[in-house]
């Protein structure tokens, strides 16, 4: 994931968490808010409830990979908060959950909306 597509500063995370819409899934919670940029930026929060450092990093890698294969509409700041089971699932399961959350928020790009509706 490119540096320009990531949320990096505390203020960016705080803005999304405070004013973003909340979408709840089995493996993750997503908060999203429109931004005024030509691109979408994504951040990840994985607490110690998920497990030790190895499990937390695995959960982030799975979330990142799920987003890499999923197209997003431009102009959104998105934060994914991993739930405790996130480190134990296969990438395909996480991808299904991520597509479902993005579809609920209407952030999924047009090309991926059709494949998301078939998965649910």
From Swiss-Prot:
Q: Which UniProt keywords apply?
A: Endonuclease, Hydrolase, Nuclease, RNA-binding, tRNA processing
Spell out the reaction equation it catalyses: Endonucleolytic cleavage of RNA, removing 5'-extranucleotides from tRNA precursor
Gene Ontology cellular-component terms listed: ribonuclease P complex
Q: Which SUPFAM superfamilies match?
A: Ribosomal protein S5 domain 2-like
- The keyword Zinc appears for this protein: no
Q: Which GO terms describe its molecular function?
A: 3'-tRNA processing endoribonuclease activity; ribonuclease P activity; tRNA binding
In short, the EC number is 3.1.26.5
GO terms of biological process kind: tRNA 5'-leader removal
Q: Which Pfam families match?
A: Ribonuclease_P (PF00825)
Quaternary structure, per UniProt, is: Consists of a catalytic RNA component (M1 or rnpB) and a protein subunit.
Q: What does this protein do?
A: RNaseP catalyzes the removal of the 5'-leader sequence from pre-tRNA to produce the mature 5'-terminus. It can also cleave other RNA substrates such as 4.5S RNA. The protein component plays an auxiliary but essential role in vivo by binding to the 5'-leader sequence and broadening the substrate specificity of the ribozyme.
The record's comment on protein family reads:
Belongs to the RnpA family.
Report the protein name in the record. Ribonuclease P protein component
Q: Which organism is it from?
A: Dehalococcoides mccartyi (strain ATCC BAA-2266 / KCTC 15142 / 195) (Dehalococcoides ethenogenes (strain 195))
From the broadest rank down, the organism's phylogenetic lineage runs:
Bacteria, Bacillati, Chloroflexota, Dehalococcoidia, Dehalococcoidales
- Which gene produces this protein? rnpA
């Amino acid at each position: 994931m490119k540096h320009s597509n990531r949320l990096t500063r505390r203020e960016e995370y705080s803005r999304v968490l405070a004013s973003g819409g909340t979408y709840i899934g089995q493996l993750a919670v997503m908060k999203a808010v429109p931004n005024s940029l030509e691109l979408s930026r994504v951040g990840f929060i994985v607490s110690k409830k998920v497990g030790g450092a190895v499990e937390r990093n695995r959960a982030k890698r799975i979330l990142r990979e799920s987003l890499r294969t999923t197209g997003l509409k431009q102009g959104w700041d998105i934060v994914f908060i991993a739930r405790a089971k996130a480190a134990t699932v296969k990438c395909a399961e996480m991808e299904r959950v991520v597509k479902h959350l993005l579809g609920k928020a209407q952030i999924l790009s047009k090309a991926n909306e059709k494949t998301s509706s078939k998965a649910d």
